[in-house]
Amino acid sequence: MALGDASSPVRFGKGASSPVDNRELFLSVFGGEVLTAFDSATVTLDKHFIKNLSGGAKSYRFPKTWKASAEYHTPGSELLGNDLSTSEQVITVDDILVSHYAISDIDRILSHFDMRSIVSNEMGRALAKVFDQNVFRQLILASRTAAASPFPGGITVTDANLANDATPSGLAWIQAIREANISLFNNDVPEDMQRYCAVPVEIFDAIKYAVDGNGQYLVLNRDFQADTAGGIDARAEMIKIDGVMVVKSRNMPTTDESSTATVFSKYRADYSTTVGVMWCPQAIATCKLMDISLETERDVRRLEDFLVSKLFVGHGVLRPEMAVEFKSA
């Protein structure tokens, strides 16, 4: 063969592909983040009160006291002590939430990627999503709790302009958040207590790009000017409106779940007009008897590995006056 002649190497990667692909038989490198669905972020875990239960306990009792009073003393009168209204909130755990899958030996052996780790990650995310959904359901139910004198009830802000339609109004939402803050103030919620608001991404985007009557951005300009606000680099995962941290979530209920069998019974309600929820950390609490854990069992008779991921928690109302539901009707 002359030095300048072209050779004909065996292209053993092309297989019998049609059209010819010289890399058909070569394996791809699979990463967990690439193959699995995008993580639906759990935004509530660090934003409300969580109490761990010990084994053998089914519920946690939270004492509740009303405000103390003061009065002027009349000379010569005896101080007998004022009455202080007290109550308690009892939060019980739900049933054990599970996610379970079996992986057959033949599929695992023939697979050229680690299917086991992918499935286990997805199982954990499935539990986290239900946890998030139930926290939002409980927050909304807290906002619907009636007053039990002297303790105030929850707060509802209803405005048709808050609807998550084709063109949600960011300006209306900014005004609604301000209105909710006034209601919290009138309920004697401390001004220095952290406040959160969760909305669908469409409403979050409308708030982020809200403009005033002159077409000037009300939030976006501030995001560009401050590194801590998010801006372009961080995609503004959180924006602050009137001291309230606004986050976006896909886990809020927005349909009528009154008879939805897959929803745990105490969280079933009509959420068809719900468009957002705002809360302080003490509005609700979560009792956790068992954190997310993964168990595996070898089933020799079926030649498979059986995976179970489980979570044992429950949610309940603590202070309904700290929860606000935003409704479109």
Which residues does each predicted region cover?
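Structured, hydrophobic secondary-structure cores that serve as assembly/anchoring elements
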Residues: 59-60, 67, 80, 87-117, ...
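Oligomerization/assembly interface segments of phage tail-like spikes and tubes
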Residues: 98, 122-123, 305-309
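Short, polar loop/linker segments at the starts of domains and inter-domain junctions
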Residues: 75-80, 262-264
